[in-house]
């Protein structure tokens, strides 16, 4: 089941491009915290051509504090995934609904982008980092996590 979901999410992210820039569709106010376990990473660069590495082959860490907060109609805050995505002014795509949270940020000057999607039901998170966007030799890291919601303590 996770492999099927991973493939669907991966295809969705890979087909997702800057033509959707400025897309904002925040349908719900959310304030969620997750603890996410690294599952695998796919690397595409001059050394690896979409090679998959399992969590135990990587130095990458789990996400202990991944937080999402949205406020209708257009605010989305991300914390704990990457410093780049934590800068909410960089977000060009923000989608929040009952099923998924999807976001993308880009820096044209640095030729760099990051995007991610989390399935709110399954907890599957896919984070894509793209370097050298404008080049034929763009580089990608696609990281898969399995996340569980953290209960808020009152």
Tell what function each PLM region has.
Residues 113-120, 143-149:
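Hydrophobic/aromatic beta-strand elements that line small-molecule binding cavities or substrate pockets
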Residues 129-154:
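Edge beta-strand at a domain terminus
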Residues 51-88, 124-131:
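N-terminal glycine/threonine-rich, aromatic-flanked beta-hairpin/loop signature
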Residues 1-26:
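Classical Sec-dependent N-terminal signal peptides that target proteins to the secretory pathway
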Residues 71-118:
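Contiguous, well-ordered beta-strand patches that form the walls/edges
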Residues 26-35, 95-106, 123-126:
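Short, hydrophobic/aromatic-rich segments at coil-to-beta transitions
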Residues 35-44, 106, 127-132:
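Generic short beta-strand segments
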Residues 24-52, 147-148:
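Tryptophan-anchored aromatic micro-motifs
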């Amino acid at each position: 089941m996770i492999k099927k979901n991973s493939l669907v999410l991966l295809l969705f992210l890979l087909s997702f491009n800057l033509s959707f820039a400025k897309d904002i569709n925040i349908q719900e106010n959310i304030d969620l915290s997750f603890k996410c376990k690294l599952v695998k990473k796919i690397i595409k660069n001059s050394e690896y051509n979409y090679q998959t590495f399992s969590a135990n082959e990587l130095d990458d860490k789990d996400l202990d504090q991944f937080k999402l907060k949205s406020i209708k109609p257009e605010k989305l805050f991300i914390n704990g995934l990457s410093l780049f995505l934590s800068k909410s002014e960089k977000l060009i795509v923000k989608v929040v609904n009952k099923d998924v949270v999807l976001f993308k940020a880009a820096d044209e000057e640095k030729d760099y982008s990051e995007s991610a999607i989390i399935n709110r039901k399954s907890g599957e998170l896919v984070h894509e980092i793209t370097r050298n966007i404008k080049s034929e030799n763009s580089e990608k890291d696609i990281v898969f996590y399995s996340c569980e919601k953290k209960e808020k303590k009152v």
